Structures are given as C-alpha cells and as structure tokens.
C-alpha cells in the first residue's frame, strides 16, 4: 500500500496497521480511497509487482526453512500477493481474499477470520505444532498472544516500546538466533 501511495502520490494510502490498528477499519479506509480516486485492482497489483524484498530477507527465509516449517500469516490478499510470494520462493501463505467487479474495481474484502493470524496459530497448536511468530505491527499482537514465543522484527519504536514484553530485533541474524534458541529441535 505504501507503493500505491508512492505511485499515485496519494499519501493516505501509506497508512498501515501501524497507524490504524484495526485491520477492518484500515481496509474500509483504503477501499473508500480507491473508489474516490477511481483506482482498480490492477493499480494495486502493479504496485505489488514493483516491491523488492528487504535486504537479507530471502537469505534469512532460506536459512530458517532449513530448520523450521515457515508459514506467512498475512493480512494481504491472494489477488495482490503473488509477485512477492514468487520472490520468496512461494512459502505457504495464509491470507484473505477480495471481491472484484467486472470493471476491475475492488468491491469488498473478505477476512478469513477476524483474528486470522491468531486462529492460524491456534490451529497449528491444536495439531501439536510449536509456533514461533515474528511481526512488526499491531496486527501481529493477536498471534503473539497465543504463539509459544513471539518476536518483533523491524518494528517501529512506538510499538515495541508499548510492548516491552515482546523481544524486539532489528536484524535477521538476531531473529534467527532467537528462533533457534526457542526451538525444541535445534541445540
């Protein structure tokens, strides 16, 4: 969405759950902006295609995959996420869906669950999996509440300061070390 803001010069698209913690409110806000400015799904897909991975992200993900099953729990939408997932080597992505009109406008969004990230963690745990979670925003707090261990990665100071009980890292190496430290399989 920040790339949509950059492409369209409409700064309001740069708001994230860091700014509007309730994801439903944020998406309602974004859809109203899209309608107001006549933007379509293709505008968002084009922005998604322009995104580059953060430096070191793919190397980190590949190293972590050597020891862990990796699932991306995201508040994005399948209709938007494909370019980024391709760059990440298509990890398992659990996210939401959009309703698209015949003219390509985004009519609505469909959340899989109000607290989809938390529900996914609980589902994996119900099958006997131990879950370590990492995120950078308010919408990740729901999964930290139930994960066996949660970590902030590159979170804004405001969020990590508000939640000092959650370890915060600014490097993938430190996060990888924390994952390994909390693993039951790696010694």
Model-flagged regions — what are they?
Residues 70-75, 129-170:
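Acidic, Mg2+-coordinating phosphoryl-transfer loop and its flanking beta/alpha structural elements
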């Amino acid at each position: 969405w920040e790339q949509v803001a950059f492409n369209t010069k409409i700064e309001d698209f740069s708001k994230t759950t860091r700014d509007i913690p309730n994801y439903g409110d944020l998406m309602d806000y974004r859809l109203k902006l899209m309608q107001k400015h006549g933007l379509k799904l293709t505008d968002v897909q084009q922005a998604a295609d322009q995104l580059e991975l953060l430096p070191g992200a793919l190397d980190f993900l590949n190293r972590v995959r050597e020891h862990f099953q990796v699932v991306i729990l995201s508040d994005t939408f399948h209709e938007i996420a494909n370019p980024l997932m391709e760059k990440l080597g298509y990890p398992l992505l659990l996210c939401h869906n959009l309703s698209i009109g015949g003219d390509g406008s985004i009519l609505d969004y469909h959340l899989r669950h109000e607290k989809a990230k938390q529900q996914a963690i609980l589902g994996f745990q119900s099958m006997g999996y131990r879950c370590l979670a990492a995120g950078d925003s308010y919408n990740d707090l729901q999964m930290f509440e139930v994960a066996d261990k949660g970590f902030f990665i590159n979170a804004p100071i405001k969020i990590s300061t508000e939640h000092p009980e959650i370890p915060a890292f600014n490097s993938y190496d430190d996060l990888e070390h924390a994952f390994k430290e909390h693993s039951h399989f790696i010694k």
